[in-house]
Amino acid sequence: RSQKIELNEFSQPTPELLELAWTFAVPGADRMRSQPTVGGGVVFIGSQSGSVYALDAKTGCVWWTFNASSEVRGSISVELGTDDLPESLFFGDFQGYIYKLEALTGKLIWRRRADPHPLTTITGSLVIYEDRVFIPLSSTEIVGAIESDYECCTFRGGVIAVDKNTGDTRWRLYSVDKARTQYSESGEVMSWGPSGVPVWSSPTIDEKRKL
């Protein structure tokens, strides 16, 4: 990201003035892919084990922990309430589930399967806009393709929109047409296509044109 120095309060001498305030060792993790989200004095972050943490931004102390089904790779998306404090949290996990939590307590409000394909995964952050949440669909089918008896490949990347209050699907847009059988390898395992075109990152909303 490029930005003119005069537009940025973070000037060149600033790093020399920074001091470590606190650290947090995430249990059971040897990597971190989820970027922290800060709101209302709280740091929200997912982890390799599937745990989602709410940490005090000043002290690093844990307010609460929620355990998802699998690794959370995207950032936690925060919906603010009327008081401009975090009200709800939205995120997806590596097994393709999407979640809505109560920001104050970490209580589960709803949990939904993003797509019926068994190898669906979610790596990008969810995007909240008006009454909907937009979810990018990706897959681990490339791993399944290693197996000689796996009929590859049928997954289709895309984006879905769900109702933020209920988690019910409003619409679903796939990147490619539905896969069809193409040919049989060795007369036993069928090959399928087209497939793929996963969406790894977060969708972008054009508020002016509602796109």
Show the residue positions of the predicted features:
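Surface-exposed loop and turn segments in beta-propeller and other repeat-based domains
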Residues: 25-26, 113-116, 172-193
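Short loop/turn segments that connect beta-strands within beta-propeller blades
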Residues: 56-59, 102-105, 163-166
